[in-house]
Curated annotation (Swiss-Prot):
Active-site feature positions: C60, D262, H264
Source organism per UniProt: Gallus gallus
Domain of life: Eukaryota
Biological processes per GO annotation: aggrephagy; autophagosome assembly; autophagy; lipid metabolic process; mitophagy; piecemeal microautophagy of the nucleus; protein delipidation; protein processing
Gene Ontology cellular component list: cytoplasm
SUPFAM superfamilies the record matches: Cysteine proteinases
Location in the cell: Cytoplasm
Domains: entry comment: The LIR motif (LC3-interacting region) is required for the interaction with the ATG8 family proteins. Required for proteolytic activation and delipidation of ATG8 proteins.
Main location: cytoplasm
Protein name: Cysteine protease ATG4A
Pfam family, one: Peptidase_C54
Function: Cysteine protease that plays a key role in autophagy by mediating both proteolytic activation and delipidation of ATG8 family proteins. The protease activity is required for proteolytic activation of ATG8 family proteins: cleaves the C-terminal amino acid of ATG8 proteins to reveal a C-terminal glycine. Exposure of the glycine at the C-terminus is essential for ATG8 proteins conjugation to phosphatidylethanolamine (PE) and insertion to membranes, which is necessary for autophagy.
Enzymatic reactions: [protein]-C-terminal L-amino acid-glycyl-phosphatidylethanolamide + H2O = [protein]-C-terminal L-amino acid-glycine + a 1,2-diacyl-sn-glycero-3-phosphoethanolamine
UniProt-listed Enzyme Commission number(s): 3.4.22.-
Length: 380
């Protein structure tokens, strides 16, 4: 595992951007240090009240999932080419993104929320997660994140279904009929179908996660070119993977080496300041990232992509047709137009209409009981 980049004419690819080491190494390092870097932390409030107060030794894949999602949020709010500079004042959205991941039970993508959501996926708190479990947990937590309003699609059986993604991302038009006015009120109270500006949009930004097994015990060399191709796509969010019980966030490659951010450093819990900003020094990796030979990768991985607009998704589909599906056999994954008839029907996931999480967002209980006929009232 090397750190310093060699002098070479080969291009380096980082999350859809190409860098040339012999021209400007510092630009590459700036690009890497702009990524949010999440590591093990200690001294946070115990998970679930009585659980662990550090994730050292078990939380590495959760941290990698946080890094991939944070990269999607940066692309959504600040753009792929946004740069982080030490001690420079950052936009409010940046602090808001960072706040989503602080180690507190009230932050939507905190280690607390992820570990507890993992219980529903059969993982006890403090147990190591694989890439697919993290993907399922992010998909569930995203339903409670109204600010970002992401559609999270996790592929099944190595197959991405275009029809299902379009169904999920094309926000349903708001009904104007009076019969639905109370539901309508309720939805706006919960902020559903609305973006940050309160407007209904035609496409929910898509976080697409593709869990894959690229071999049995070792990565099959037949997949290597296609795997590397994914890091060149402008929609790339890299990949989750590593070695058994040792997760890394892969952000690019140089030749036959993968470039990754490593969560295996234990830092102390950092909370936000009273004004909402976060002391962010420890959330950016300020040295050259690690590299490992692609053949040493465990075959269980999850690829990530972010499509802010529908045209980004259409562009991704044509890149996949061209680069991934050109192999006649042993394709890395399949991209199909129609939902396979033998699969159970696709139902876009929705957040329960009334939950304890949503309750604080409803101004008064009167409004809640107007809805009795339309929604079963869950315990609030």
């Amino acid at each position: 595992m090397e750190s310093e980049f060699p002098d070479t004419d080969e291009p380096v690819w980082i999350l859809g951007r190409q860098h040339h080491l012999n021209e400007d190494k510092s630009k590459l390092l700036l690009d890497v240090s702009a990524r949010l870097w999440f590591t093990y932390r200690r001294k946070f409030s115990p998970i679930g009240g009585t659980g662990p107060s550090s994730d050292a030794g078990w939380g590495c894949m959760l941290r990698c999932g946080q890094m991939m999602l944070a990269q999607a949020l940066i692309c959504r709010h600040l753009g792929r080419d946004w740069q982080w500079e030490k001690h420079k004042k950052q936009p409010e959205e940046y602090h808001r993104i960072l706040h989503c991941f602080l180690d507190r039970k009230d932050c939507c993508y905190s280690i607390h929320q992820m570990a507890q959501m993992g219980v529903g996926e059969g993982k006890s708190i403090g147990e190591w997660f694989g890439p697919n479990t993290v993907a399922q947990v992010l998909k569930k937590l995203a339903l409670f994140d109204e600010w970002n309003s992401l559609a999270v699609y996790v592929s099944m059986d190595n197959t991405v279904v275009i029809e299902d993604i379009k169904k999920m991302c094309r926000s349903p038009p708001q009904s104007s009929s009076t019969a639905h006015s109370s539901a309508h009120l309720h939805r706006s109270a919960l902020g559903r179908n609305r973006n940050a500006a309160g407007l209904c949009t035609g496409w929910k930004p898509l976080l697409l996660i593709i869990p894959l097994r690229l071999g049995i015990n070792h990565i099959n060399p037949v997949y290597i070119d296609a795997f590397k191709e994914c890091f060149k796509m402008p929609q790339s969010l890299g990949a989750l993977g590593g070695k058994p019980n040792n997760a890394y966030y892969f952000i690019g490659f140089l030749g036959n080496e993968l470039i990754y951010l490593d969560p295996h450093t234990t830092q102390s819990f950092v909370d936000s300041e009273e004004n909402g900003t976060v002391d962010d020094q420890s959330f950016h990796c300020q040295q050259a990232p690690h590299r490992m030979k692609i053949m040493n990768l465990d075959p269980s991985v999850a690829l990530g992509f972010f499509c802010k607009e529908e045209c980004d998704f259409d562009n991704w589909c044509s890149l996949v047709q061209k680069e991934i599906l050109k192999q006649q056999s042993l394709r890395m994954f399949e991209l199909v137009q129609k939902h396979p008839p033998h699969w159970p029907p696709f139902i876009p996931p929705t957040k329960p209409e009334v939950t304890t999480t949503g309750a604080e967002l409803i101004e008064s209980t009167d409004k809640l009981f107007e809805l009795e006929e339309e929604f079963e009232i869950l315990s609030v």
